[in-house]
Amino acid sequence: MAQLFFRYGAMSSGKSIEILKVAHNYEAQGRKIALMTSNVDDRSGVGTVASRIGLHRKAVPISEDLDLFNYVSELNKSDVESGNGRVACVLIDEAQFLKRHHVLECAKIVDELKIPVMAFGLKNDFQNHLFEGSENLLIFADKVEEMKTICHYCGHKATMNLRINSGKPVYEGEQVQIGGDESYYPVCRFHYFHPNKQR
């Protein structure tokens, strides 16, 4: 039975490497996947899923106006007609940047096309507000799973993302600022509020 999955975690929790692993596993069994990512994240180029350990792969960029249901329906139809087989799974990286309509389209892919959708992304931003995509995935997903990582400062479980500028914490600004290890640290709640204190 197809389901909508949301796997979330703080920065550096292995979300992108996990999605690349899932894609590989499906394809190793001869099954077709649709690999997609938000066009907002351009750190490695628009339409690229890239992990911090260096693995990367091209993906379909999701723009604000892309209808995911129609895209997957057409992809599925053309693949079946050409003999390439049906799409077995839709994989979406950087899902926090999805709009509400994208998440509803993902649910429609699951419910009407019977294709599982696995979305990976951050849950909360650097101010601990939910991203639009994450909020709607938490509402509409059949299964939600946390991907764990450790606090940059103490090694406890990290649940938050601390924005950094020149080594100093930043608590105000635009919600979206694309960056990696140089801009964000995964942190526990204590070190989110007290980054310079020992726990």
UniProtKB/Swiss-Prot annotation:
Keyword Cytoplasm part of the UniProt annotation: yes
Active site: E94
UniProt-annotated binding residues for ATP: G9, A10, M11, S12, S13, G14, K15, S16, D93, E94, A95, Q96
Record PROSITE patterns: TK_CELLULAR_TYPE
Pfam families, sorted: TK (PF00265)
A Gene Ontology biological process term: DNA biosynthetic process
Localization per Swiss-Prot or TrEMBL: Cytoplasm
Matches recorded under InterPro entries: P-loop_NTPase, Thymidine_kinase, Thymidine_kinase_CS
Keywords: ATP-binding, Cytoplasm, DNA synthesis, Kinase, Metal-binding, Nucleotide-binding, Transferase, Zinc
Reaction(s) the record says it catalyses: thymidine + ATP = dTMP + ADP + H(+)
Binding site for Zn(2+): C151, C154, C188, H191
Highest taxon of the lineage: Bacteria
GO molecular function terms attached to this record: ATP binding; thymidine kinase activity; zinc ion binding
EC number(s) stated in the UniProt entry for this protein: 2.7.1.21
Location, primary (coarse class): cytoplasm
GO cellular component assignments: cytosol
Family per record: Belongs to the thymidine kinase family.
Complexes and interactors: Homotetramer.
Protein name: Thymidine kinase
Species the sequence originates in: Lactobacillus johnsonii (strain CNCM I-12250 / La1 / NCC 533)
Source lineage: Bacteria, Bacillati, Bacillota, Bacilli, Lactobacillales
